[in-house]
Amino acid sequence: MAKPTTLYDKIWNDHLVDEQPDGTCLLYIDRHLVHEVTSPQAFEGLRVAGRKVHAPEKTLAVVDHNVPTTDRSKPNPDPESAEQIAALATNARDFGVQYFNEFDKRQGIVHVIGPEQGFTLPGTTIVCGDSHTSTHGAFGALAHGIGTSEVEHVLATQTLIQKKAKNMRAVVDGKLPDGVTAKDIILAIIGEIGTAGGTGYVLEYAGEAIRALTMEGRMTICNMSIEGGARAGLVAPDEKAYEFLKGRPLTPKGANWEQAVRYWDTLRSDDNAHFDHEIRLDAANLPPIVTWGTSPEDVVSVAGFVPDPAKIEDEAKRLSKERALAYMGLNAGTKITDIKLDRVFIGSCTNGRIEDLRAAAKVINGHTVNGHVNAMVVPGSGLVKEQAEAEGLDKIFIKAGFEWREPGCSMCLAMNPDKLAPEERCASTSNRNFEGRQGFKGRTHLVSPAMAAAAAIAGHFVDIRDWKAA
């Protein structure tokens, strides 16, 4: 009888080309996504060596990190960013890779456009020179970020050298309360295991609450696997995944689709498969979450208080949290709902999809952004923007006082014109709250789209559960 295997084991075994005695493996890569920041050196390496891209049809290129989200008819204000964008256009043309430029309505954040185009498929291996490649694991794909030298290796060989990770599972059972979302689930998991808790593992998400999520919700969860230290995140594919993908430009068609679904139906962990580590959460007990510090593990209920580092026994950890409090300009014991905000950012590869914009618009409709808050909505792709405008969401945001922007990574990271000023405080639907992540000395609090929307109106954090009841 065959040994029970996990979903990760199955995908790994299906793509294993070679394994050396020391555990070093050569893995076949099905899909490769590239953007303007981590690809220029890789393409130049190919050019210098006189190599071609091995399988150009398996690579998709898009600009996202550096593109301005305002008027794109004007020159990029940052010369280095403009150079990187121009380099990607040249490299895509020279090496025969499909490319979505900043004027293409299919352009957007790389981890939004992959599933949107049907480039992301269950059971595939997917890499990108970007840490949030784990997003694609929502479809049952083994997806993770790689370095620039590895980008060159994949372009040249369609393979990757690596060692197999261990198996970890997060089981989230129960039903989410009103106002609690996928973003709160993943922040709760990271709060439970810490930012190093998943190190050395591929993390599969399972349980009633995960199965109940939409594909957008599953993408939010898998997106932040890296914030929990995991190499990748996975959710077993099901009818929701198939429905999302069917008919998209790059998915199989006709008999090929039916054949693919038959294979995808085998992609789930066996009942008695071994996991090296497992955690369990009850969704019914989860609150809306806000991060208070400079690490995604610094989580607290919106109904709670800024914690006191003095109560931490471990000296190194205590000093780290004291530094975080000082950087964030907060005092221990402060009510989370008393924290006032300067900026609100709704977007990113974590929460920039149509479902996220609908959730935010539902809260905002009929209200006005607080006078001391600057708020912006940045759709995750041109197609998300187009759909939102077809539904009239842009009008809701604009009427309320939000800026309605062009697609891109935007204020998730300080690599384009959308940045926080020093000591500005932002409620953000993105994935990282590190020091300087959104701008020099900027202060970031991670929240769900609905929480961000309510905070924009109130000017401070509010418990979305009370908001809905109001």
UniProtKB/Swiss-Prot annotation:
Pfam families to which the protein is assigned, alphabetical: Aconitase
GO biological-process terms attached to the record: L-leucine biosynthetic process
Stored InterPro entries: 3-IsopropMal_deHydase_lsu (IPR004430), Acnase/IPM_dHydase_lsu_aba_1/3 (IPR015931), Acoase/IPM_deHydtase_lsu_aba (IPR001030), Aconitase_4Fe-4S_BS (IPR018136), Aconitase_4Fe-4S_dom (IPR036008), IPM_dehydratase_rel_enz (IPR050067), IPMI_cat (IPR033941)
Root EC class: lyase
Cofactor: [4Fe-4S] cluster
Catalytic activity: (2R,3S)-3-isopropylmalate = (2S)-2-isopropylmalate
Enzyme Commission number: 4.2.1.33
PROSITE patterns reported for this sequence: ACONITASE_1, ACONITASE_2
Co-factor note (free text): Binds 1 [4Fe-4S] cluster per subunit.
Keywords, in A-Z order: 4Fe-4S, Amino-acid biosynthesis, Branched-chain amino acid biosynthesis, Iron, Iron-sulfur, Leucine biosynthesis, Lyase, Metal-binding
Biological role: Catalyzes the isomerization between 2-isopropylmalate and 3-isopropylmalate, via the formation of 2-isopropylmaleate.
NCBIfam families hit by this protein: leuC, PRK05478.1, PRK12466.1
Record note on quaternary structure: Heterodimer of LeuC and LeuD.
Protein name: 3-isopropylmalate dehydratase large subunit
Gene from which the chain derives: leuC
